[in-house]
């Protein structure tokens, strides 16, 4: 087996600064490595000056060798699960993209998934303080969730966010991005990132084959960029705007709390005008199917069909207590939609031990701290959870 990410990919999407081959890699085994040899440890952004040469470090070489022998490394369990169930994993999608376009340039950084910082105006229920400053500001909620082992980043501070932000800019400034083929910029919310415009200018200067380069911005849809930013974005011929939208109207406001649905709906319609004018190559959703919304997917697909935005769906396996795979398959199958991608996710035989008591506790705590009531916006899902404890 081969994975482009282990040879030329980097994902930097949490405030600990872990340098993973892709965002799906579960690098706990690297983080727990106690060997003194620095080449054996998971590198972080705070340990380096540049991304150049990163894939020659021991953890990456070991991943490359394991895959070449036909074995999925421990950190690649999510792709292993998806491929076993017949889904097109991140590994397969990226390999196909690079093979179709003959995009490989050995020894270079070609695939990036980064958060320039974690400034965010939302507190999504499946997120955590390591990826959202809004979450990081909710100290009491984080303490309560930690009592139930529900938060992976327990004590984020403004100082840590700022340290990451400046170190990220320093490392990117020292990195050769001339052969970049794909970048996904997320957050936080990218349009709030302090260095977003600076980074767009760097990409515009350095990428030597812009026609072979895809720029993807992952946004929660709450921000429509100012003209100077928009003009710079529209210079890239392969611009993709991806909306992290898992529901509509009141359920959307509950799951991804912080901004009213009317604002998000209006912004997406503005982006659609640029798509219709040929200025944006794709508008697409990344909708996470979780135990919070699995029964409401038909209304979501209808909405996006009506406004003319492509849909993409992602199964959630972590955190376990928000996964649909805690529910029996026959329960999930009652909510099939006729959409193959959604239905394949609903019917997948993925084994996750039920923790529905924790699911209810998580819902209760988030309700309390966001002044929302999940039961009022998805009573059916809450009842299903209770019936299957």
Model-based region annotation:
Residues 1-158, 176-177, 349-389:
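N-terminal pre-core extensions flanking Radical SAM catalytic domains
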Residues 70-77, 81, 107-108, 184, ...:
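Metal-dependent nucleotidyl/phosphoryl-transfer cores and adjacent nucleic-acid-binding surfaces
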Residues 168-176, 230-231:
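Short amphipathic alpha-helix with an adjacent loop that forms part of the alpha/beta core around
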Residues 109-119, 130-166, 178-194, 206-226, ...:
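Core AdoMet radical
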Residues 73, 174-177, 209, 235, ...:
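Alpha-helix termination/capping residues and helix-transition junctions
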Residues 195-201, 226-233, 296-298:
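Distinct, well-ordered alpha-helical segments
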Residues 16, 216, 236-242, 262-388:
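Conserved C-terminal portion of the radical SAM core fold
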Residues 204-207, 274:
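Short, acidic, metal-binding catalytic loop of nucleotide-sugar glycosyltransferases
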């Amino acid at each position: 087996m081969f994975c482009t990410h282990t040879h030329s990919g980097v994902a930097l999407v949490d405030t600990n600064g872990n340098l993973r081959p892709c965002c799906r890699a579960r690098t706990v085994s690297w983080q727990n490595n106690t060997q003194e040899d620095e080449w054996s440890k998971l590198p972080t952004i705070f340990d380096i000056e540049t991304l150049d040469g990163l894939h020659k470090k021991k953890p990456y070489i070991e991943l490359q060798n394991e895959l070449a022998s036909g074995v999925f490394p421990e950190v690649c369990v999510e792709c292993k699960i998806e491929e076993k169930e017949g889904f097109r994993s991140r590994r397969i999608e990226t390999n196909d993209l690079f093979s179709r376009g003959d995009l490989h340039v050995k020894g270079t950084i070609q695939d990036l998934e980064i958060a320039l910082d974690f400034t965010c105006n939302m507190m999504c229920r499946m997120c955590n303080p390591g990826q959202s400053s809004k979450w990081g500001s909710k100290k009491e909620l984080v303490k309560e969730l930690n009592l139930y082992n529900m938060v992976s980043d327990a004590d984020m501070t403004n100082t840590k966010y700022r340290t990451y932000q400046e170190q990220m800019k320093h490392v990117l400034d020292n990195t050769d991005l001339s052969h970049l083929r794909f970048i996904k910029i997320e957050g936080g919310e990218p349009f709030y990132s302090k260095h977003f415009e600076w980074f767009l200018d760097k990409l515009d200067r350095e990428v030597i084959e812009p026609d072979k380069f895809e720029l993807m911005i992952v946004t929660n849809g709450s921000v429509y960029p100012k003209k100077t930013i928009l003009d710079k974005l529209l210079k890239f011929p392969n611009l993709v705007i991806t909306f992290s939208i898992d529901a509509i109207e009141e359920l959307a406001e509950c799951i991804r709390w912080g901004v009213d649905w009317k604002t998000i709906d209006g912004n997406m319609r503005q982006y659609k005008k640029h798509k219709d004018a040929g200025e944006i190559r794709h508008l697409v959703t990344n909708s996470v199917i979780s135990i919070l919304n699995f029964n409401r997917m038909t209304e979501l697909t209808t909405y996006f069909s009506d406004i003319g935005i492509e849909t993409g769906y992602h199964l959630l396996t972590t955190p376990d207590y928000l996964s649909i795979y805690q529910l029996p398959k026959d329960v999930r199958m009652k909510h099939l939609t006729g959409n193959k991608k959604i239905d394949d996710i609903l019917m997948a035989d993925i084994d996750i031990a039920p923790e529905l008591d924790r699911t209810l506790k998580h819902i209760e705590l988030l309700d309390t701290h966001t002044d929302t009531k999940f039961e009022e916006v998805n009573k059916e899902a809450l009842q299903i959870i209770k019936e299957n404890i």
